[in-house]
UniProtKB/Swiss-Prot annotation:
Voltage-sensitive motor protein that drives outer hair cell (OHC) electromotility (eM) and participates in sound amplification in the hearing organ. Converts changes in the transmembrane electric potential into mechanical displacements resulting in the coupling of its expansion to movement of a charged voltage sensor across the lipid membrane. The nature of the voltage sensor is not completely clear, and two models compete. GO terms for molecular function: chloride:bicarbonate antiporter activity; protein homodimerization activity; secondary active sulfate transmembrane transporter activity; spectrin binding. PROSITE patterns: SLC26A, STAS. CDD domains: STAS_anti-anti-sigma_factors, STAS_SulP_like_sulfate_transporter. It comes from Mus musculus. The STAS domain mediates dimerization, with both STAS domains latched onto each other in a domain-swapped manner. The N-terminus domain is involved in dimerization such that each N-terminus domain embraces both STAS domains. The STAS domain harbors a unique anion-binding site important for the fine regulation of the high-frequency electromotile properties. The transmembrane domain consists of 14 transmembrane segments organized in a 7(+)7 inverted repeat architecture that can be divided into two main helix bundles, the ''core'' domain and the ''gate'' domain. The keyword S-adenosyl-L-methionine does not apply. InterPro entries: S04_transporter_CS, SLC26A/SulP_dom, SLC26A/SulP_fam, STAS_dom, STAS_dom_sf. This is Prestin.
Length: 744
C-alpha cells in the first residue's frame, strides 16, 4: 500500500464538530458588525463619469472597436496559416450559400453575394467573437423573404399596368426595396438595444424555444425549396399556414415537375449527404473538410453549361449575375410601419443565434464575448449594409463550425472569405450564371440536416422537463403554422408564462432530520429521514409573492397536516362534548385559546403605551387545555412549532409579507410557534420594509438555519416544561418527595 493510501481516511469516518450558540436573528446580529459603506454623491458619480483619462479613452475604443485590441496582438507566425486555410474553406462554402439564401429572401441571387461581403468586413471591426461566420443565414433569409412576398406578392400589379408575371425585374426591384427597409430597421433596433445595454434580452429566448423555432424554420425552408428542386412554378406564400399552402401547391403541380431539374438536384443531394458523412467520419484525419458545396456548384454549373439544360430542358438557372458593386442607395423608410413587427423578430432572432454560437465557441477557446457589443456590431452590419443593398444577416451555424474547425484564429479568416466573394462579384460571377436552381435547393436542404436532428430533443425533454418540452412543442407548432414572426411572439409569451407557472406552482416539501445530524431532507424521498416530534419543517423552492402567496398558505396546511382552523374547531367540539356531559352551557361558549396579539397588519391590536414605553402583546400565548377535556380531542401529534425553510426563497413582496404575518397569527391563535429559517439578507430586508417586524418580538422568530430553529424550539419547550413543573402546587408533588436545592 502506498503512502497516499495509508493516509486516506474512509468517508464514513470523516467528521466535523461545531460548537456555537443557537443563532436567532437578534443573537446573530449582535455578533456581526456592518461594514461602513462609502456612498458617493450624485455629483461625484457625474464627475467620475465625465472625467476623461487616457485609460478610459483606450477602454472605450477597445470596447467599441475590438479590432484595435486584438489586431496589434496578432501572432502572425502562429495564426496566419490557420486563418488562411479557414478563410478559403469558409469562402468556398459562403459562395453557394449566399446564392441559395438569396432565393429564400426572395431577391435576385447577386444580393446574396453582397450580403456575404459587406457585413463580414464590418463585423471584423466591431465584433467580439473570433470564430463565427457572419453572413446570410437560412432562417433570417426566410423571414426576410416572408416580408417581401407579403408586401410584393407574385401576382402583384406594378403601377403602370405591368403585370408581375411579365415584369419579374420590376417585382424583384420592389422586393429588394422591402428587404433593404426591413434590414435597416432591424439594424437600428439591434444598435439601439446594444447602446442601451440590452444584451440580456437573449436570455428570454431559452434553448428549447430557439431549437423549436429553428426546427420550424427548417420545415419552412424545406417546403420553400421543394419548388426549385422539382422545377415547378408555384406561387410563393407567406403568413399564417403558408407552409401548408406551399406544400399543397407543390403537390398539386408535381405532375408538371421537370425531370431533368429533379435529377440534377437529387444527384447533388446524394453527393452532399455522402460527402458530409465522409467529412464527419474522417474529420480527425482530414486537414480541412472537403468543400462539397463548392464542388457541387462547379459540377452543377459545368453540367448545365455543357448540356445547355436551360435552353434544351427548361431547367431554371441562377441567371444574370451583374459584375461590379452597386452604388449606395437609401432604403425606403416609408415602409417601416408595415414591417416593424418583422424587423423586431428578425433583430432578436438574429442576435440570439449569433450570441449562442459565439458563446459556445468562446467557451471552447477560453475567451469572452460581449453581448451588448455583439448587438452593436450586428446593428452596424445590418443598418449600414442596407445602404449597399444587403439583406439581414446573422451567424451561419454551418459556416461558423467550418471556420473554427479548419483552424481559424481571428476574424481575418472571415475577411479572407469575403474577399473571395468580392472576386466573384467583380470578375467571375458570370461563370455561375448557368448554375441550376435545383443545385442550390439541394445545398440548402442538406444543410438543414442539423436543424431536423433537433427533433431528437423531444425524448430528452420528455425525460428531463415537461415544461421545456411544452416550450419546444408550442414554439414549433406556432412558428410552423402562424409564421415565423407571430410564432416567435407566441413562443416568447408561452416561455414567460412558464416562468410565472413555475413560481406560482413550485414544489413544496416537508423536511425531516437525518438522525444525529444537522441535515434536513425531504421525508418522502428517503427512508432514513425522520420527522422531529412536535416540529414540522416546510420548504418552498420559489419566491413568495402575489401570484403564489395564497397557494403557499394552503400548501403549508395541506402538506404538514397542521391546520389551525381544524385545530380550533376540534377544540370547540371537545368543549361542547364536555359541556354536554357536565351539563354546563356556559362551558360550550368558552373561548378555547385566547390570543390578544394580531399580526396581519390590518386588524392588528395596537400596542399599549405605558411610561413612554411601547408594550406589544405576545406573539403566541400558550394556554393550558384542561386535562379532563383531552379525552374529547382526536388523537394526533401535538405540534408546537412550524419551521418555514426560506433557504430557497429569494424575495418576498408586500402580499407575501402579509400572508406570512397571517400565518404567524393564525398558528399563534392555537398556540403554535412559526419560525423562519435560512432567510437571505434580501428576504430580511423585504420583511423589514413591509413592517413585518413592527412588533420587535417577531425578530425572535428568525433563525440562521433550520437546525438553529429546531434547537431553539426544543430549548423553548424544555424551558416551558420546567416552568410548568416548578409552578405545580406543593400538594401535587409525591408524598415522600423532598424538594431539592441547587448546589452552591
Amino acid at each position: 500500500m502506498d503512502h497516499a493510501e495509508e493516509n486516506e481516511i474512509p468517508a464514513e469516518t470523516q467528521r466535523y464538530y461545531v460548537e456555537r450558540p443557537i443563532f436567532s436573528h437578534p443573537v446573530l446580529q449582535e455578533r456581526l458588525h456592518v461594514k461602513d459603506k462609502v456612498t458617493e454623491s450624485i455629483g461625484d458619480k457625474l464627475k467620475q463619469a465625465f472625467t476623461c483619462t487616457p485609460k478610459k479613452i483606450r477602454n472605450i475604443i477597445y470596447m467599441f472597436l475590438p479590432i484595435t485590441k486584438w489586431l496589434p496582438a496578432y501572432k502572425f507566425k502562429e495564426y496566419v496559416l490557420g486563418d488562411l486555410v479557414s478563410g478559403i474553406s469558409t469562402g468556398v462554402l459562403q459562395l453557394p450559400q449566399g446564392l441559395a439564401f438569396a432565393m429564400l429572401a426572395a431577391v435576385p441571387p447577386v444580393f446574396g453575394l453582397y450580403s456575404s461581403f459587406y457585413p463580414v468586413i464590418m463585423y471584423c471591426f466591431f465584433g467580439t467573437s473570433r470564430h463565427i461566420s457572419i453572413g446570410p443565414f437560412a432562417v433570417i433569409s426566410l423571414m426576410i423573404g416572408g416580408v417581401a412576398v407579403r408586401l410584393v406578392p407574385d401576382d402583384i400589379v406594378i403601377p403602370g399596368g405591368v403585370n408581375a408575371t411579365n415584369g419579374t425585374e420590376a417585382r424583384d426591384a420592389l422586393r429588394v426595396k422591402v428587404a433593404m427597409s426591413v434590414t435597416l430597421l432591424s439594424g437600428i433596433i439591434q444598435f439601439c438595444l446594444g447602446v442601451c445595454r440590452f444584451g440580456f434580452v437573449a436570455i428570454y429566448l431559452t434553448e428549447p424555444l430557439v431549437r423549436g423555432f429553428t426546427t420550424a424554420a427548417a420545415v419552412h425552408v424545406f417546403t420553400s425549396m421543394l419548388k426549385y428542386l422539382f422545377g415547378v412554378k408555384t406561387k410563393r406564400y407567406s403568413g399564417i399556414f403558408s407552409v401548408v399552402y406551399s406544400t399543397v401547391a407543390v403537390l398539386q403541380n408535381v405532375k408538371n415537375l421537370n425531370v431533368c431539374s429533379l435529377g440534377v438536384g437529387l444527384m447533388v443531394f446524394g453527393l452532399l449527404l455522402g460527402g458530409k458523412e465522409f467529412n464527419e467520419r474522417f474529420k480527425e484525419k482530414l486537414p480541412a473538410p472537403i468543400p462539397l458545396e463548392f464542388f457541387a456548384v462547379v459540377m452543377g454549373t459545368g453540367i448545365s453549361a455543357g448540356f445547355n439544360l436551360h435552353e434544351s430542358y427548361s431547367v431554371d438557372v441562377v441567371g444574370t449575375l451583374p459584375l461590379g458593386l452597386l452604388p449606395p442607395a437609401n432604403p425606403d423608410t416609408s415602409l417601416f410601419h408595415l414591417v416593424y413587427v418583422d424587423a423586431i423578430a428578425i433583430a432578436i432572432v438574429g442576435f440570439s443565434v449569433t450570441i449562442s454560437m459565439a458563446k459556445t465557441l468562446a467557451n471552447k477557446h477560453g475567451y469572452q464575448v460581449d453581448g451588448n457589443q455583439e448587438l452593436i456590431a450586428l446593428g452596424i452590419c445590418n443598418s449600414i449594409g442596407s445602404l449597399f443593398q444587403t439583406f439581414s444577416i446573422s451567424c451561419s451555424l454551418s459556416r461558423s463550425l467550418v471556420q473554427e474547425g479548419t483552424g481559424g484564429k481571428t476574424q481575418l479568416a472571415g475577411c479572407l472569405a469575403s474577399l473571395m466573394i468580392l472576386l466573384v462579384i467583380l470578375a467571375t460571377g458570370f461563370l455561375f450564371e448557368s448554375l441550376p436552381q435545383a443545385v442550390l435547393s439541394a445545398i440548402v436542404i442538406v444543410n438543414l440536416k442539423g436543424m431536423f436532428m433537433q427533433f431528437s430533443d423531444l425524448p430528452f425533454f420528455w425525460r428531463t422537463s415537461k415544461i421545456e418540452l411544452t416550450i419546444w412543442l408550442t414554439t414549433f407548432v406556432s412558428s410552423l403554422f402562424l409564421g415565423l414572426d407571430y410564432g416567435l411572439i407566441t413562443a416568447v409569451i408561452i416561455a414567460l408564462l412558464t416562468v410565472i407557472y413555475r413560481t406560482q406552482s413550485p414544489s413544496y416539501k416537508v423536511l425531516g432530520q437525518l438522525p444525529d445530524t444537522d441535515v434536513y431532507i425531504d421525508i418522502d424521498a428517503y427512508e432514513e429521514v425522520k420527522e422531529i416530534p412536535g416540529i414540522k419543517i416546510f420548504q418552498i423552492n420559489a419566491p413568495i409573492y402575489y401570484a403564489n402567496s395564497d397557494l403557499y398558505s394552503s400548501a403549508l396546511k395541506r402538506k404538514t397536516g397542521v391546520n389551525p382552523a381544524l385545530i380550533m374547531g376540534a377544540r370547540r367540539k371537545a368543549m361542547r362534548k364536555y359541556a354536554k356531559e357536565v351539563g354546563n352551557a356556559n362551558v360550550a361558549n368558552a373561548t378555547v385559546v385566547k390570543v390578544d396579539a394580531e399580526v396581519d397588519g390590518e386588524n392588528a391590536t395596537k400596542p399599549e403605551e405605558e411610561d413612554d414605553e411601547v408594550k406589544f402583546p405576545p406573539i403566541v400565548i400558550k394556554t393550558t387545555f384542561p386535562e379532563e377535556l383531552q379525552r374529547f380531542l382526536p388523537q394526533g401529534e401535538n405540534v408546537h412549532t412550524v419551521i418555514l425553510d426560506f433557504t430557497q426563497v429569494n424575495f418576498v413582496d408586500s402580499v407575501g409579507v402579509k400572508t406570512l404575518a397571517g400565518i404567524v397569527k393564525e398558528y399563534g391563535d392555537v398556540g403554535i410557534y412559526v419560525y423562519l429559517a435560512g432567510c437571505s439578507p434580501q428576504v430580511v430586508n423585504d420583511l423589514t420594509r413591509n413592517n413585518f417586524f413592527e412588533n420587535p418580538a417577531l425578530k425572535e422568530l428568525l433563525f440562521h438555519s433550520i437546525h438553529d430553529a429546531v434547537l431553539g424550539s426544543q430549548v423553548r419547550e424544555a424551558m416551558a416544561e420546567q416552568e410548568a413543573t416548578a409552578s405545580l402546587p406543593q400538594e401535587d408533588m409525591e408524598p415522600n418527595a423532598t424538594p431539592t436545592t441547587p448546589e452552591a
